A protein has these predicted regions:
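Beta1-alpha1 glycine-rich phosphate/pyrophosphate-binding loop at the start
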Residues: 2-93, 177, 187-225, 277
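FAD-binding core/adjacent interface of flavoenzyme oxidoreductases
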Residues: 2-21, 92-176, 180, 266, ...
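C-terminal auxiliary extensions adjacent to catalytic cores
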Residues: 12, 375-422
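Short hydrophobic core segments
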Residues: 27, 117-127, 251, 271-281, ...
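A Rossmann-like FAD-binding core segment of flavoenzymes
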Residues: 90, 94-101, 195-304, 310
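FAD-site-proximal beta/loop scaffold in flavoenzymes
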Residues: 139-168, 271-341, 348
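Internal hydrophobic alpha-helix adjacent to the cofactor/substrate pocket in enzyme cavities
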Residues: 195-198, 337-364
């Protein structure tokens, strides 16, 4: 450096190193992915990280409400909201695209919009229906997979009622609805159908005794994991709405005319049906199977901090993550409650890694589980107490509203929430 009486001249200027912002790439805007993004944007400044969210739709849908949209008791528009409503666009770049491939070794994701590199990856791609290789199910059964599928089921059922009312030679099998699966989704869908069928009968002048709704379940029980007393209540309530059950009866084939059931060791029965809805199993997204990460039915048994085994820069949340409840040595169920909590912890652990701090183990805070049986009935356990009827239904709607509030605040809750509480 040379000093003069008028100037200070710096002969050589060393460049100031610029710290590169880490890129956090989040795949999927379901409960887990969106909770991760919302919590990241709350905690990080614009210059702290580049956050990219990729989702095939520009909206998020409440997957725990899809059974209502499928039955026709809730409009599909009520189930979804724009992603732009809940992300800060100066902090989060949203890419509407279909994820096509994930290369965790090259740290590269390929989508319909191009290629995306990352420093940290969060996989929250949600679930797919599992048909267990049963012939015909993929082709002839409907599945409550997303908003579009729910709309399809609603319109299909309405079409069957409308066609029956117009045709000269009545095909009563049009009015038979078979629901495969007596788990959470199947039972909640049956509850909504029990409310919706009388409305359809009145709208299309269909005698109620012409309609048949049958739930078939391969397992020997309804709602596995629920208290037997609550299960008994649920079955009784659904039967009072005209729902029939065939438990311990697996579906072995689906055709355009209906389903074939195994009713004994060498005994089978074919039931004609105008509508078959499959709600008997889910799996993680198939892209998981192509990553090279060890998985079971596209679900990864994640480390305690939600990272994929062997990949310190990859987190997995929601339906694609498998965690074992060590108290009962069984996986935690893939619920919205757990997915949102995983999103919170995932965001916290990402920030910890960026700061060079240790990550934390994820421990689910299970507040309970409630299954609806229609608009004003439900069963469940909340805060250690069993409940049924309108009280349980009230709690169910409060849980649904809370999920909206945690992501989008009071504004989103008032716009999309459920307030028909009594």
């Amino acid at each position: 450096m040379i000093f003069t009486n008028r100037h200070i001249i710096q002969e050589k200027v060393e460049p100031i190193p610029v710290k590169k912002r880490p890129t956090i790439l989040v795949l999927g805007a379901g409960y887990g992915g969106l909770a991760t993004v919302v919590n990241l944007q709350k905690s990080l400044g614009v210059d702290d990280a580049e956050i990219i969210l990729i989702n095939k739709n520009d909206y998020h849908y409440e997957s725990t409400w899809l059974h209502e949209a499928a039955a026709g008791t809730l409009k599909p528009e009520q189930v979804r909201y724009p992603i732009s409503r809940v992300i800060q666009q100066d902090k989060v770049k949203f890419v509407k695209a279909e994820v096509e491939a994930i290369d965790v070794k090259a740290k590269m994701v390929t989508s319909s919009a191009g290629q995306h590199t990352y420093d940290y990856l969060v996989i929250g791609l949600g679930f797919e229906g599992e048909t267990f290789g049963i012939p015909g199910l993929d082709k002839y059964a409907l599945s409550i997979a997303n908003v579009k599928a729910a709309r399809q089921i609603r319109e299909h059922i309405e079409y069957q009622f409308a066609t029956w009312s117009l045709e000269e030679v009545k095909a009563d099998s049009r009015l038979t609805i078979i629901v495969g699966g007596a788990g959470f989704t199947g039972i909640e869908f049956l509850g909504e159908l029990g409310d919706r069928i009388p409305e359809l009968c009145e709208e299309f002048d269909v005698p109620a005794d012409k309609v048949k709704v049958l739930c078939v379940e391969a397992a020997p029980m309804v709602l596995p994991g629920f208290d037997p007393e609550l299960v008994e209540y649920a079955v009784r309530q659904l039967k009072s709405k005209g729902i029939e059950f065939s438990i311990g009866t697996p579906v072995v084939e689906a055709t355009p005319e209906g389903v074939k059931l195994k009713t004994g060791d060498e005994e089978f029965e074919f039931i004609e049906a105008g509508t078959v809805v499959w709600a008997a199993g889910v799996r993680g997204n198939r892209l998981i199977e192509e990553t090279g990460i060890e998985n079971m039915r596209a679900r990864v048994k994640v480390e305690k901090d939600l990272r994929a085994p062997g990949f310190d820069d990859v987190f997995i949340v929601g339906d694609c993550a498998l965690m074992i409840n060590e108290e009962i040595n069984r996986p935690f169920p893939p619920t919205a409650q757990i997915a949102m909590q995983q999103g919170d912890m995932c965001a916290n652990n990402l920030i910890a890694l960026m700061k060079g701090q240790p990550t934390q183990a994820f421990v689910p805070d299970l507040k309970g589980s409630i299954a609806s049986l229609g608009s004003n009935d439900a069963i469940g356990v909340a805060f250690g107490k069993k409940m049924t009827g309108k009280k349980a239904s009230f709690m169910k709607k409060m849980v649904d509203n809370r999920a909206l509030y945690l992501i989008g605040g009071a504004g989103l809750t008032f716009k999309k929430g459920k307030f028909d509480l009594l």
